[in-house]
Amino acid sequence: MRLEKHASSLVDYTQPLSFVFNNKAYKGFKGDTLASALIANDVLYYARSFKYGRKRGIIGAGVEEPNALVSLEIGGRYTPNMKATEIMLYDGLSAVSSSNPHSIDFRAMIKPLHRFMPAGFYYKTFIKQKVWSIVEDRLRSLSGFSKAPSVTDEDVYDHIFQHTEVLVIGGGVAGMSAALEVLSGSKVARVILVDERENLGGELTNEFTTDQTATLWFQEAKGKLQKYRDEDNSRLKILTSATAYAWYDHNYIEVLQTYGTGQSMIHESGQNARKVLHKIRTKEVILATGAHERPMLFETNDLANIMLSQSVRRYIN
């Protein structure tokens, strides 16, 4: 089900896309994530829990999503354990759940034994026994994760060395404001702005449907950043779909930027890098990473259609 389109929607309803999930064809639009497209197609279940085999739905809308792990594409472009909430939809996408929620639940047969199987029981029960080599593969197959790739990766990867005065990690309101403050306060300082999402704005984008002030502020701030880039692109670099994952001594930080899945880039001219590792040396670091909402604790809070309030607002937008 789709909501009525609004002016600030991140989804372009003029560009329909076709994709396949768990061997079934669906329709989505440019700007959708795989998760948002599946929700719009009334898909409820994406996985089963490890211990009890309970069907799981989507809880989050980004990196915080614990359930919707999928295997993307096949052959040399096969990628395991990707989160449906982080995959931007493209025409011809093909994905399957890491643990099929619609398969027969063989784990139901061992439910009466659950009281004898506390977390980590297999390490004490089997690790010193000769049977470990027999049961290990079976136990790991129940874990709900994708199979490891079995063929050579066809994609191209690259790395870049970068130097800057200020590195801002987080492209929401705080991060954009910090970058603008540095740029306006110095005529020579270089800034790199990093955000994990495809678009800047962070949680502010969740307010566009109801808060005109948020929309106006974002458009103005984005325009100022673009002006700095146009005037001197060496002073401001914006890395979207990028994760700062390591901070070493002397402010050496590694950022992994994803340009797309291998299959989504297959029609581009040349053989472009699918992922680029930015090796950044910076004088100062500003952390503007925001926070994740904690789920509420109550009985059956793992049922499908129970989401974080942040996630609901994000899918609406």
Which role does the model predict for each range below?
Residues 185-205:
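Glycine-rich FAD pyrophosphate-binding loop
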Residues 174-180, 203, 306-309:
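Short glycine/serine/threonine-rich phosphate/pyrophosphate-binding segments
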